[in-house]
Amino acid sequence: MDLTPREKDKLLIFTAGLVAERRLARGVKLNYPETIAYISAALMEGARDGRTVADLMHFGTTLLSREQVMEGIPEMIPDIQVEATFPDGTKLVTVHQPIA
């Protein structure tokens, strides 16, 4: 399989997002990289499903709560930016204060 660097990055984010999803299902609190991967993967999948940028910006704030991440993680992540592929092209999605 011959993937571009961008495709490799997307695959890595998606895989890390799956690991984070499984840990959440077991009740394990997510660390910084897991939190970023979980939210990023969900945003990328939402884009592929045809959701709008505005919808994803709001959706990104509903994915995780403070109780689901390790102490101090919400303060470490003031925003997340993901370059996602939408049906009409690639766009940048920015989620401010992703963990309420």
Swiss-Prot record:
E.C. no: 3.5.1.5
GO MF terms, alphabetically ordered: nickel cation binding; urease activity
Catalytic activity: urea + 2 H2O + H(+) = hydrogencarbonate + 2 NH4(+)
Highest taxon, organism lineage: Bacteria
Gene Ontology BP, a term: urea catabolic process
Keywords associated with the record: Cytoplasm, Hydrolase
Gene3D superfamilies according to UniProt: Urease, gamma-like subunit
One GO CC annotation: cytoplasm
Pathway: Nitrogen metabolism; urea degradation; CO(2) and NH(3) from urea (urease route): step 1/1
Cellular compartment(s): Cytoplasm
Pfam entry (one): Urease_gamma
Subunit structure: Heterotrimer of UreA (gamma), UreB (beta) and UreC (alpha) subunits. Three heterotrimers associate to form the active enzyme.
NCBIfam families registered for this protein in UniProt: PRK13241.1, urease_gam
PANTHER family, sorted: UREASE
Membership in a protein family: Belongs to the urease gamma subunit family.
Name this protein carries in UniProt: Urease subunit gamma
Species the sequence originates in: Pseudomonas fluorescens (strain SBW25)
Lineage of the species this protein comes from: Bacteria, Pseudomonadati, Pseudomonadota, Gammaproteobacteria, Pseudomonadales
